[in-house]
């Protein structure tokens, strides 16, 4: 399991937190405590929780007060309270006088009879041992086993071996290999003897399938898999670096309850030949036996060197094949075959790189690979997995308690089988119980996906921690606070830059206490229940009160993730209809928001300091530039640019549908529409008399600047006895008969008038 290593902690201040693998010894050390009477507590021995009569925790159970602390502050199970400061625990029940808060941080542990693999590290064990994941799973869950065939047999009569060679073969396969190996063989091994032993040995590494098929492999075939272990003693050295790829495979077994291995001793002549030739191995103990020889100081360093040498060889082979590949460019079959070889080598190189990266991590972090296998299982503090009374004789029990109970019961059953001489390591009962124990630990840590699909509501530790509803994101990082709401954002260009639209329902919920306060202060009601009744009945004057409240407050809008300071800005709320928050489109780039379903959180600053900072620092009118580069942040988006183009474009000459029938004369020609001012144009547009792209002439009293090509005179119109008109392409000037200018008109569209009214 993982643990938190807190460094440099003084006065409850945490300077750094490190998450790493914890050994089984560390789990026992952190979970055990020595009482003043000398008793060591911490181990959970029974699956019981509470006594059904007294409703008190059972001793050595999952809620034991001796292990986790008292339920009531400074009170033991006997009912005695803390009085004497020199006596820290009760001599009768053995419970320490302490605060009940210790039941939130004190751990316990379960001592497992058979080691189990942590399900999170199953894949890494497969990478480290360079064995397929399915094979590792079959060993862990005891569905398949390993048939270990003895590499060296005593010489038969028809075989003649040298005495020196036979001594080496006997010693290599001895149970006490490290003790019995001679010094003259441990320093240097002759090349011819090594090559002879390599050809002599044959290993059978068989995973039994359901059809009981046995696949036999030569030692040379398992050469890559088996030779990845540096499992010899420290005194054993190879003569040359090239012999790193040659490692003698052996096992060392001890008949102990902690390590349920089979004692293999070729010098033991009492064993019959059939039992001696093949040995069946099952369970996680095999993996623990392999991993315990990995030491980050020596074996992993040598293994890292070996893998680097293997990577170099693969790269050289790829380089050589790549050079040959171009010579067969015009020969299709040879080209494809070489291409497949290179692809296979690249896959092998990536696999070796992944293994090298894992080994380097173990070495640099100074971790032992055997820590990935658990012999002691930590138990969470009881207040994190409580039993809650719901009333009416009903209780709610945490799912973790059921998982712990299952583990303890299966562990006790396995211990009972081991204590019974009728059962041994190879019986079906022990194999099945080992598998059940491994599955129960897996369900505690991470539940199987197949069981989740069966609508089983029990939660594992991973389900409690991970995801949106997990402990981190739900309770620690995403805490719910008062005076806050959340809704979808939509665009509203009619809002001002510093305004945001807030729905009526959200405004009532957020400003609920303030509305009640104003209702009482305006003498509309005298009691709080009366004010609540006015709000629930939605009286006619309620909107006026809400408008009055909103004028005195700013609201903070936040869009996750908040990557910079512009991710939170203050706006003046404006009451709108609907259920969505309305926002001006130009403030969206600061939030990195768009209107495709994004949500934003709304908060109300309450204190005087926070309200002052909202007006001065967070108000959107004051956040116009990026603090990093100084460039403007209120840049129009694509929809704004497209809308401005559509609003100001002149499509009358191309699209005839924009001309209303009332604007055509008897000949079908377009009438010229004249307006005296901009307001008349907007009124006509709101009355649906003109369209956005309708061409109009509007009277203009300001100075006008034109391009040179637009001042070509089109025609001169003379009105009898009144005035005459000079008409250009987009410009008209009226003069009286004495030559004084009467008025001037410019040609534009309704959309351009609307755009001009928005700018000025």
From Swiss-Prot:
- The reply to whether Plastid figures as a keyword in the UniProt entry is yes
| Xref: Gene3D superfamilies | 1.10.40.90, 2.40.40.20, RNA polymerase II, clamp domain, RNA polymerase Rpb1, domain 3
SMART domains in the record = RPOLA_N (SM00663)
Q: What is its EC number?
A: 2.7.7.6
**What sort of enzyme, by top EC class, is this?**
transferase
InterPro entries for this protein? DNA-dir_RpoC_beta_prime, RNA_pol_asu, RNA_pol_N, RNA_pol_Rpb1_1, RNA_pol_Rpb1_3, RNA_pol_Rpb1_3_sf, RNA_pol_Rpb1_clamp_domain, RNApol_RpoC1
Cofactor dependence is on: Mg(2+); Zn(2+)
Say where the protein is mainly found. plastid
Residues that coordinate or bind Mg(2+): 594, 596, 598
A matching Pfam family: RNA_pol_Rpb1_3
Gene Ontology CC: one annotated term: chloroplast
This entry's comment on the bound cofactor is: Binds 1 Mg(2+) ion per subunit. Binds 1 Zn(2+) ion per subunit.
Where is this gene product found? Plastid, Chloroplast
Could you name the domain of life of the organism this protein comes from? Eukaryota
**What is known about what this protein does?**
DNA-dependent RNA polymerase catalyzes the transcription of DNA into RNA using the four ribonucleoside triphosphates as substrates.
- Give the multimer and partner information: In plastids the minimal PEP RNA polymerase catalytic core is composed of four subunits: alpha, beta, beta', and beta''. When a (nuclear-encoded) sigma factor is associated with the core the holoenzyme is formed, which can initiate transcription.
Describe the family membership recorded for this protein in Swiss-Prot or TrEMBL: Belongs to the RNA polymerase beta' chain family. RpoC1 subfamily.
> What name goes with this protein?
DNA-directed RNA polymerase subunit beta'
């Amino acid at each position: 399991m993982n643990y938190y290593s807190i460094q440099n902690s003084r006065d409850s201040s945490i300077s750094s937190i490190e998450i790493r693998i914890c050994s089984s010894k560390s789990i026992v050390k952190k979970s055990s405590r020595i009482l003043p009477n000398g008793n060591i507590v911490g181990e959970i021995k029974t699956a019981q929780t509470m006594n059904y009569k007294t409703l008190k925790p059972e001793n050595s159970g999952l809620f034991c007060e001796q292990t986790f602390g008292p339920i009531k502050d400074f009170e033991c199970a006997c009912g005695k309270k803390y009085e004497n400061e020199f006596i820290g625990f009760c001599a009768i029940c053995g419970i320490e006088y302490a605060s009940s808060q210790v039941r939130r941080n004190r751990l316990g542990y379960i001592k497992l009879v058979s080691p189990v693999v942590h399900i999170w590290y199953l894949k890494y064990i497969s990478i480290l041992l360079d064995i397929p994941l399915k094979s590792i799973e079959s060993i862990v869950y005891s569905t398949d086993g390993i048939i270990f065939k003895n590499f060296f047999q005593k010489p038969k009569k028809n075989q003649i071996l040298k005495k020196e060679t036979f001594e080496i073969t006997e010693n290599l396969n001895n149970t006490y290999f490290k003790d019995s190996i001679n010094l003259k063989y441990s320093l240097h091994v002759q090349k011819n003897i090594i090559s002879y032993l390599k050809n002599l040995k044959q290993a059978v590494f068989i995973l039994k399938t359901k059809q009981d098929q046995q696949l036999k492999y030569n030692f040379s075939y398992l050469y890559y898999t088996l030779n990845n272990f540096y499992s010899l003693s420290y005194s054993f050295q190879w003569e040359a670096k090239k012999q790193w790829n040659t490692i003698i495979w052996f096992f060392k077994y001890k008949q102990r309850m902690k390590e349920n291995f089979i004692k293999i001793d070729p010098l033991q002549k009492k064993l019959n030949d059939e039992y001696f030739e093949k040995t069946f191995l099952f369970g996680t103990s095999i993996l623990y036996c392999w991993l315990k020889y990995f030491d980050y100081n020596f074996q992993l360093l040598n293994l890292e060197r070996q893998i680097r040498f293997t990577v170099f060889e693969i790269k050289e082979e790829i380089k050589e094949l790549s050079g040959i590949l171009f010579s067969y460019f015009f020969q299709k079959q040879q080209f494809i075959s070489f291409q497949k070889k290179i692809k296979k080598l690249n896959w092998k190189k990536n696999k070796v790189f992944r293994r090298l990266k894992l080994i380097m991590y173990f070495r640099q972090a100074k971790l032992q690979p055997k820590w990935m296998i658990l012999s002691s299982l930590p138990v969470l503090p009881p207040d994190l997995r409580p039993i809650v009374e719901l009333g009416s004789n009903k209780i709610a029990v945490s799912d973790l308690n059921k998982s712990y109970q299952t583990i303890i019961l299966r562990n006790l059953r396995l211990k009972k089988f081991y204590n019974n001489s009728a059962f041994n390591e190879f019986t079906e009962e022990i194999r099945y119980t080992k598998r059940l124990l491994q599955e129960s630990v897996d369900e505690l840590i991470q539940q199987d996906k197949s069981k989740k699909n069966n609508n089983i509501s029990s939660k594992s530790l991973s389900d409690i921690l991970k995801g949106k509803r997990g402990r981190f994101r739900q309770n620690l990082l995403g805490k719910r606070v008062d005076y806050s709401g959340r809704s979808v954002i939509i665009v509203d260009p009619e809002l001002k830059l510093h305004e945001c639209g807030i729905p009526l329902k959200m405004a009532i919920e957020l400003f609920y206490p303030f509305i009640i306060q104003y209702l009482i202060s305006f003498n509309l009601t005298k009691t709080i229940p009366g004010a609540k009744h006015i709000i629930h009945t939605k009286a006619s004057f309620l909107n006026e009160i809400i408008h009055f409240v909103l004028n005195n407050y700013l609201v903070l809008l936040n869009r996750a993730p908040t990557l910079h300071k512009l991710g939170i800005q203050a706006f003046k709320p404006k009451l709108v209809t609907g259920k969505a928050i309305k926002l001006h489109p130009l403030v969206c780039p600061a939030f990195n928001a768009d209107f495709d379903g994004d949500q934003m959180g709304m908060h109300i600053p309450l204190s005087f300091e926070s309200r002052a900072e909202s007006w001065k620092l967070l108000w959107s009118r004051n956040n116009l530039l990026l603090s990093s580069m100084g460039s403007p942040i209120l840049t129009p988006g694509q929809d704004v640019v497209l809308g401005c183009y559509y609003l100001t474009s002149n499509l009358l000459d191309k699209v005839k549908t924009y001309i209303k029938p009332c604007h055509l004369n008897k000949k079908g020609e377009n009438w010229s529409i004249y307006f005296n001012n901009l307001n008349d144009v907007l009124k006509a547009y709101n009355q649906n008399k003109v369209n956005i792209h309708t061409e109009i002439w509007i009277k203009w009293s300001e100075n006008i600047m034109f391009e040179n090509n637009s001042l070509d005179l089109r025609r001169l119109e003379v009105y009898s006895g009144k005035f005459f008109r000079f008409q250009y392409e987009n410009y008209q000037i009226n003069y009286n008969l004495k030559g004084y200018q009467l008025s001037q008109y410019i040609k534009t569209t309704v959309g351009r008038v609307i755009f001009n009214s928005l700018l000025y």
